[in-house]
């Protein structure tokens, strides 16, 4: 039986599976809709499709290295229960190995890479069917070190935060790790004040000005005094979000800029991943979260 666009659409409407999966299912079953549905179920694709609109904001971050290449990546699940289990950690290892042994530019690229004869995307679909939660490879970034560069890397013990720092010049491995650990803990948004955008400054100053004017303690103070207060608060805020301006957590007597200068290096790039950052997560109480696991 010919596999028509109408048949593919009907199968997609009934199962929620992707168009290509539906087409493949129909081709392998001679265009028989019911057999195609069974085919999709056996492959775990129907089950995965039903979870596609759920929020996956938990998971793990990982670091993999090969030669001059370093990759930081994040794989998400719906709950931290799943992120702690062996199957999920095995999947993390597979994703990391696939990333480091290939040269994908985008998530879409790496999902197409063959792993033991099937695309990584299919491997993830099988994991979804087995584990029972939505799982996604959210993002990754590849660093190719130049000969005059060095790295500072840190992966927190719970695998929820990771940082990669790239330096021009050679830095001691321990100090590089300590600086990466600092970034993981203190969350600087920019390397230096020079990197802070004009848009950020233009959005922050009016907020600080309004806060100062609305503070009862500032009632009656002239505008020039309020302006100086706002500038002081803005400078303090910029120091808090600028890596080089921050106080070094390992040695509070030093600023990060002092450590960088003492080691004769410059910070070229700063990459910090934290699981789920920027994802709007559905709030569940603990009992509801447990029941959600039971009812999967």
Swiss-Prot record:
Classification via CDD domains: UBA_EF-Ts
Record region (Involved in Mg(2+) ion dislocation from EF-Tu): 79-82
Gene Ontology terms: cellular component: cytoplasm
Keyword Cytoplasm: yes
Subcellular location per the Swiss-Prot or TrEMBL entry: Cytoplasm
InterPro entries found in the cross-reference section: EF-Ts_dimer_sf (IPR036402), Transl_elong_EFTs/EF1B (IPR001816), Transl_elong_EFTs/EF1B_dimer (IPR014039), Transl_elong_Ts_CS (IPR018101), UBA-like_sf (IPR009060)
PROSITE patterns (alphabetical): EF_TS_1, EF_TS_2
Family note: Belongs to the EF-Ts family.
Name the record gives this protein: Elongation factor Ts
